[in-house]
Amino acid sequence: MTPRYVLAIDQGTTSSRAILFDRAGDIVGSAQREFAQIFPQPGWVEHDPREILTSVYATLTELLSRGQIDPRHIAALGITNQRETTVVWDRATGQPIHNAIVWQSRQSHTICERLKSEGHEALVRERTGLLIDAYFSATKVRWILDHVEGAQQRAERGELLFGTIDSWLVWNLSGGQAHVTDYSNAARTLLFNIHTLDWDDDLLALLDIPRAMLPQVRDSSSVYAHTRPQFFFDHPIPIAGIAGDQQAALFGQACFQPGMVKNTYGTGCFMLMHTGAQAVRSRNGLLTTIAWGLDGRVEYALEGSIFVAGSVVQWLRDGLRMIERAGDSQALAVQVPDSGGVYLVPAFVGLGAPYWRSDVRGAMFGLTRGTHKAHFVRAALEAMAYQTRDVLDAMQSDAGIALTELRADGGAIGNDFLAGFQADILGVPLLRPRLTETTALGAAYLAGLAVGFWTSREQIAAQWGLDRRFEPQMEVARREKLYAGWQQAVAATLAFHVD
């Protein structure tokens, strides 16, 4: 029977989705399930790994049954996942020994501070391209081994396995056939040497993490295992693609040439610039990471993460009650010709790239008696664009490549005002794709390439479709004046920090 589809699992921070794509890269069907967020203490975020599995299984069942999809028509399965989130489980029983510690969680902060105080930042930066931060997986693993009785000894005996969410899903979908991850996820653990392309013994020793726990690292497009027959009505499907969510979006946006950039406007913003075979070391507070591994070689990227983007609109809606629906923000923003000199620096949980300051908090500047709700909302949307420019200016400086366009995805960029203002403040066109599910599409493309469903990246690039192109309209002098005001606001925010 000729395969018609590729299936993607998009396992995110708040929900799991299953999306079926046809050969043209169009969506045939989808299903989604949310799951619980667990907050044991302020600043800690955990998930139940078993509930994540249940949510994934439910989406697969719903998608296939509702669409009456014959599993024999599915060529392959690709997985994309929330990165850095950490699971440790029992090799024999498959049961997790602790909740998954989520990428957002700060519970391993003290371990990070110890590593910094011992002077290990330069080593970690050189080997991994990352900063010492609780964001990444390594200190989360150390925390679990420290806080679950007997875990260190069991790990040393080879009884425990570690994985990011992709590894956890492949292990369970395959019935324990494969304990694997891909280069893009391994590069986010703080344990992987992005130059030698292997787990780094010095970093493992630094945190006393046994190598026996770690998954095998493979290309992002490869047949790792097959699904257990019971998942697809006794029809095993090759699990053939893995990529962390932001790298998958870069692939789904067909950013295959050095210098191409995508920005995902979600709860936060995540920008990746493809840098090809070169691992560019940042001088400006960005992360050097692996984009993907294909055909036995890896390609690299520069990454900048903004902690608060679309969530500022949720704050306007839920916290301040300024709007009833997120979509109302656009209508309010265009009621005024500008923000009236108001700047919002949404450092609610600190500032990410390129500042990396967790000790600052949000601030607002330029308020007058004439400031009203529309100015406030407009300033909140403009803050996303200013933060994006901060990161993209750093990327261009690091890579020595001038930005010619920005490919944008994510829910927030459906806001036409934001898209237009972003193009204005960057001075380059913003391209919004026809298909916004670029993360899942990237995972599908990687899986499809592994089994020959798609033949090449050139074929994939030709399928990329444009919804709308936003050209910059603002005069250069006005653009730079507005951005200078933003820089002043950030400088003042950095000066007013918390202990």
Swiss-Prot record:
It holds the Pfam family FGGY_N. It is an enzyme of class 2 (transferase). Pathway: Polyol metabolism; glycerol degradation via glycerol kinase pathway; sn-glycerol 3-phosphate from glycerol: step 1/1. Inhibited by fructose 1,6-bisphosphate (FBP). GO terms for biological process: glycerol catabolic process; glycerol metabolic process; glycerol-3-phosphate metabolic process. It catalyses: glycerol + ATP = sn-glycerol 3-phosphate + ADP + H(+). ATP binds at residues 13-15, 267, 310, 314, 411. The keyword ATP-binding applies. Keywords: ATP-binding, Glycerol metabolism, Kinase, Nucleotide-binding, Transferase. The keyword Zinc-finger does not apply. ADP binds at residues 13, 17, 267, 310, 411, 415. InterPro entries: ATPase_NBD (IPR043129), Carb_kinase_FGGY (IPR000577), Carb_kinase_FGGY_CS (IPR018483), FGGY_C (IPR018485), FGGY_N (IPR018484), Glycerol_kin (IPR005999). One of its GO terms (cellular component) is cytosol. Sn-glycerol 3-phosphate binds at residues 13, 83-84, 135, 245. GO terms for molecular function: ATP binding; glycerol kinase activity. Belongs to the FGGY kinase family. Key enzyme in the regulation of glycerol uptake and metabolism. Catalyzes the phosphorylation of glycerol to yield sn-glycerol 3-phosphate. HAMAP family: Glycerol_kin. This is Glycerol kinase. The gene is glpK.
